[in-house]
Amino acid sequence: MAKKIVALVGDGIGPEIMEAGLEVLEALAEKTGFDYEIDRRPFGGADIDAAGPPLPDETLKASREADAILLVAIGSPQYDGVAVRPEQGLMALRKELNLYANIRPVKIFDSLKYLSPLKPERISGVDFVVVRELTGEIYFGDHILEERKARDINDYSYEEVERIIRKAFEIARNRRKIVTSIDKQNVLATSKLWRKVAEEVAQDFPDVTLEHQLVDSAAMLMITNPAKFDVIVTENLFGDILSDESSVLSGTLGVMPSASHSENGPSLYEPIHGSAPDIAGQGIANPISMILSVVMMLRDSFGRYEDTERIKRAVETSLAAGILTRDIGGQASTKEMMEAIIARL
């Protein structure tokens, strides 16, 4: 039976790089027999422009029934400061699908080391994953703004913490088997719970080493010794900040994918960068982050490990051959980058 993939086409450069990702998927399917169907839907500003809500009911229904979801950048300056914004649709989708675990791999391509703001010897061997709890804590607590006082409620249950930490340990089992749990347990009650749960979950994974870091120390280590990390797991707010910090290590957002997983429903895969409206429609956007998001989908949702390695090798050899888009120091167009990768499948 064909796998159903919903493609949520966003704003700015979104349509261009989504098509590049889907063309690579199509080329792979022709070689391997992967059976799938694509349900393309506008998302983000396009929905709002059509006088609709940021997350239409039919889009939510299709997403719930899908085997996997591909999403590309949303947002535009025209929605800044207005009541209805594209980002509200994404937040609602995460909540409705219970996408509790955000997975962001950080790996430096050898051929792109020169882009990093850190010295080559400092980023050598960097290959870690940030696992961020995505649906709880202060972002989803009550937000109370008064005339001269404000409160944001930080709230976590045992179950919310347990499932995200368990996810991190499961990922670590297939890597270097080190989990670094990041908290602020010397100050915050939620972090005291976080550390307690981490210690308890670790008992179920005797083959995996658990380490603890306070968030301020972790932020420093991510710059001074990033190769130390294997799997980082942390709460929503800390994860938001640290995952963005980690993205700087590569020197470009154009090659970084991410995934958001639920417990039982479909997962969502997307590049980490924005919609880049300043270059939209010019055919120069880097499609690699979208293509690598497709890679994560093939691996995590469909278990097609050989296919994922095939695309990753094609990306790496294309970069090593000097085929680079403008954001990473070359002159290749979106189409030329995509075609180079397809040719190397």
Curated annotation (Swiss-Prot):
Organism domain of life: Bacteria
EC class: oxidoreductase
Binding, Mg(2+): D216, D240, D244
Subcellular location: Cytoplasm
Binding site for substrate: R94, R104, R132, D216
Any single biological process term in GO: L-leucine biosynthetic process
Cofactor note: Binds 1 Mg(2+) or Mn(2+) ion per subunit.
Pfam families (UniProt xref): Iso_dh (PF00180)
InterPro entries: IsoCit/isopropylmalate_DH_CS, IsoPropMal-DH-like_dom, Isopropylmalate_DH
GO cellular component, one term: cytosol
Keywords: Amino-acid biosynthesis, Branched-chain amino acid biosynthesis, Cytoplasm, Leucine biosynthesis, Magnesium, Manganese, Metal-binding, NAD, Oxidoreductase
SUPFAM superfamilies associated with the record: Isocitrate/Isopropylmalate dehydrogenase-like
Binding site residues for NAD(+): G274, S275, A276, P277, D278, I279, A280, G281, Q282, G283, I284, A285, N286
Primary location group: cytoplasm
Marked site (Important for catalysis) residue numbers: Y139, K184
Family designation: Belongs to the isocitrate and isopropylmalate dehydrogenases family. LeuB type 1 subfamily.
Quaternary structure note: Homodimer.
Name used for this protein in its record: 3-isopropylmalate dehydrogenase
Species: Streptococcus pneumoniae (strain ATCC BAA-255 / R6)
